[in-house]
Amino acid sequence: MNLILFGPPAAGKGTQAKRLVEQRRMVQLSTGDMLRAAIASGSELGQRVSGIMERGELVSDAIVIELIEQRLPEAEAAGGAIFDGFPRTLAQAEALDAMLAGRGRRIDLVVRLKVDDAALMQRIAGRFAESGRADDNPESFKVRLDAYNRQTAPLLPYYEGQGKLVEVDGMGSIDQVAAAIDAALTGAAA
């Protein structure tokens, strides 16, 4: 099964993806984690994307598509992938569909975590205080949320038109959200 966790920054995508990795033995393909690892390694790629991410801007389609393509064989071996933070643009969604189709696979389900902006701001403040992640400062977060609303949220009709979109209330506890995602996955597998 290939699943996209969709939602604004701080909606809980990473939290839910980690739980699914443990319970369903899927591979989490988080472009944010991959990009942060590149920055931490000091690689040429990391140096190129560091400033972009600190400003809260989106990294180019070409870079994130390349990162995902490198990790797809690992996901296939595990029996499925959880795409977290990808795709973020229509070009990325179309590239992902083409990559998977070339391997005889497809996106099975897109779960949109719905969380209101006030709760997102509260979550990001807590996460920034805990992690100190450069892209979690309030200014960068506002840029990221705006980028999500302008560039990523418009993907919803793309997946809705394919009959793959399920909306989950992301305002509940971690366990409540997990139960709703599990119900959606069970329905998609039936």
Curated annotation (Swiss-Prot):
What organism is the protein native to? Phenylobacterium zucineum (strain HLK1)
Xref: PANTHER family? NUCLEOTIDE KINASE
Coarse class of the protein's main subcellular location:
cytoplasm
Map out region (NMP) in residue numbers.
Answer: 30-59
Record note on domains: Consists of three domains, a large central CORE domain and two small peripheral domains, NMPbind and LID, which undergo movements during catalysis. The LID domain closes over the site of phosphoryl transfer upon ATP binding. Assembling and dissambling the active center during each catalytic cycle provides an effective means to prevent ATP hydrolysis.
Entry binding sites for AMP: T31, R36, E57, L58, V59, G85, F86, P87, R88, Q92, R133, R144
Lineage in the entry? Bacteria, Pseudomonadati, Pseudomonadota, Alphaproteobacteria, Caulobacterales
Q: What is this protein called?
A: Adenylate kinase
User: What the protein does?
Assistant: Catalyzes the reversible transfer of the terminal phosphate group between ATP and AMP. Plays an important role in cellular energy homeostasis and in adenine nucleotide metabolism.
